[in-house]
Curated annotation (Swiss-Prot):
Residues bound to Mg(2+) 2: 179, 181, 233
Homology family: Belongs to the XPG/RAD2 endonuclease family. FEN1 subfamily.
Summary of subunit composition and partner proteins: Interacts with PCNA. Three molecules of fen1 bind to one PCNA trimer with each molecule binding to one PCNA monomer. PCNA stimulates the nuclease activity without altering cleavage specificity.
Comment on bound cofactor: Binds 2 magnesium ions per subunit. They probably participate in the reaction catalyzed by the enzyme. May bind an additional third magnesium ion after substrate binding.
Region (N-domain): 1-104
Taxonomy of the source species: Eukaryota, Fungi, Dikarya, Ascomycota, Pezizomycotina
Source organism per UniProt: Aspergillus terreus (strain NIH 2624 / FGSC A1156)
HAMAP family: Fen
Protein name per Swiss-Prot or TrEMBL: Flap endonuclease 1
Length: 395
């Protein structure tokens, strides 16, 4: 799930933090990828009739199809992927996971009912909600990656947190995940949509944490508190607190402690904090997650030549893939992993820090843009109000 509407908050308040571009812009870069999030996206990329891709024996193969071809696409574009798998979830997350399981059970029942009485759209909608990544999915994807010569590591707990550690240490250029909470774990750069299919034609979003903090005018502590208030995987959200309210509360009060105090002392009782809301524990999980140091031997990784015959045995003979396509893909892997060894020119130069004048200019432009947006929204609201007040039939 990640952080609710964080992308919206950053895009509206720190637009310079987000850069959208083509996959080939990342040629020569090493990227740590949240494997579980990727596998989940492969599994929900179902056919219109709501069915998973299956082998002749009835085994699901959507995850393997996605992992093989999306990884191939990255390597074709000169990217060197490293997959990071989730370990055991933190205890605080168990409540959220239990809710997700309950929702999936409800969705399974609704899916069966929709197949009997509902529309095709209902069937597909509920089918997507029943999807979950299993140990078998993970094990098969690890086997596939090994045969492809693509490295992977296991995180002690959250994969996004481990990706962030590797990115901060410079072992990879960025962390790649659809979960915005990767920024809470202090990933300097987050890439989104990297493992999407080419058909979706979604540009790769590159989000820079330092620019987001600069645009929001926050330090990391305030940013984490904002993210918890927006709604994260560890806690229930506070009802009626949307992105604009969350941002205002943090800006007005400075910390979650002060926000909680304000809400509890508010005579109007506009907001109600859930009974069990251990925000300090959630904050601690973001500030000090259970991760391995980037120099730990278990964080060593390297790209190797693919095992072509092993891939044919696994994907073609065991899973029913097309042999010509698998052999063609393996040949591309072999060729393009060598090409990706070429260094990017930017690796030879250190980025120049922005001067105070440049920062001030950026902030001024950003503030002007915000004022313009607010003015436009007011004008639109006024026009709507006037249109409603106008008698029907009046020109």
């Amino acid at each position: 799930m990640g952080i609710k509407q964080l992308y919206q908050v950053i895009s509206e308040n720190a637009p310079d933090a987000i850069k959208a571009g083509d996959i080939k812009n990342h040629f020569g870069r090493k990227v740590a990828i949240d494997a579980s999030m990727s596998i989940y996206s492969f599994l929900i990329a179902v056919r219109s009739e709501g069915q998973q891709l299956m082998s002749d024996t009835g085994e699901t193969t959507s995850h393997l199809m996605g992992m093989f071809y999306r990884t191939l696409r990255m390597v074709d574009n000169g990217i060197k992927p490293l997959y990071v798998f989730d370990g055991a979830p933190p205890k605080l997350k168990s409540g959220e996971l239990a809710k997700r399981t309950a929702r999936k059970t409800e969705a399974t029942e609704a899916h069966e009912e929709a197949k009997e009485t509902g529309t095709a759209e209902d069937v597909e909608k509920f089918s997507r909600r029943t999807v979950r990544v299993t140990r078998e999915h993970n094990a098969e994807c690890k086997k596939l990656l090994k045969l492809m010569g693509i490295p992977y590591i296991d995180a002690p707990t959250e994969a996004e947190a481990q990706c962030a550690v590797l990115a901060r240490a410079g072992k990879v250029y960025a962390a790649a995940s659809e979960d915005m909470d990767t920024l809470c774990f202090e990933a300097p750069i987050l890439l989104r949509h990297l493992t999407f299919s080419e058909q979706r034609k979604e540009p790769i979003q590159e989000i820079h944490l330092s620019r987001a903090l600069e645009g929001l005018d926050m330090d990391r502590a305030k940013f984490i508190d904002l993210c918890i208030l927006l709604g994260c995987d560890y806690l229930e959200p506070i009802p009626k607190v949307g992105p604009n309210t969350a941002l205002k509360l943090i800006r007005d009060h400075g910390s979650l402690e002060k926000v909680v105090e304000y809400i509890q002392n508010d005579p109007k009782k506009k907001y109600v904090i859930p009974e069990d809301w251990p925000y300090q524990d959630a904050r601690e999980l973001f500030l000090h997650p259970d991760v391995r140091d980037a120099n730990d031997p278990e964080c060593d990784f390297k790209w190797e030549a693919p095992d072509i015959e092993g891939l044919v045995e696994f994907l073609v003979k065991d899973k029913g893939f097309n042999e010509d396509r698998v052999r063609n893909g393996a040949a591309r892997l072999q060729k393009n992993l060598k090409t990706a060894q070429q260094s990017r020119l930017e690796g030879f130069f250190k980025p120049v820090a922005r001067s105070d004048e440049e920062k001030a200019t950026l902030k001024r432009k950003h503030d002007e843009k915000l004022q313009e947006q607010k003015k436009r929204k007011k004008e639109e609201a006024k026009a709507k109000k006037e249109a409603k007040a106008r008698p029907r039939g009046a020109g």
